[in-house]
């Protein structure tokens, strides 16, 4: 039984890390797009 709980906990941690990585990638893409637009929009 402890092995099952350990695998469940490990899967939950892996899923949380994957979700966090996905959110970080999405935020980076949005921020990079906004940064690129603001850079190209500047007159100088």
UniProtKB/Swiss-Prot annotation:
The entry's localization annotation reads: Host membrane
InterPro entries (alphabetical): EPV_E5 (IPR012555)
Q: Which cysteines bridge via disulfide bonds?
A: none
Query: Would the keyword Iron turn up in this protein's UniProt record?
Result: no
Entry's family note: Belongs to the papillomaviridae E5 protein family.
- Kindly state the subunit structure of this protein: Dimer or monomer.
* Protein name, entry field: Protein E5
Supply the source organism for this entry.
Bovine papillomavirus type 1
Designated gene of the protein: E5
């Amino acid at each position: 039984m402890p092995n099952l709980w350990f695998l469940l906990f490990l899967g939950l941690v892996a899923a949380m890390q994957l979700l966090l990585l996905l959110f970080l990638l999405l935020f980076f893409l949005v921020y990079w797009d906004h940064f690129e637009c603001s850079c190209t929009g500047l007159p100088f």
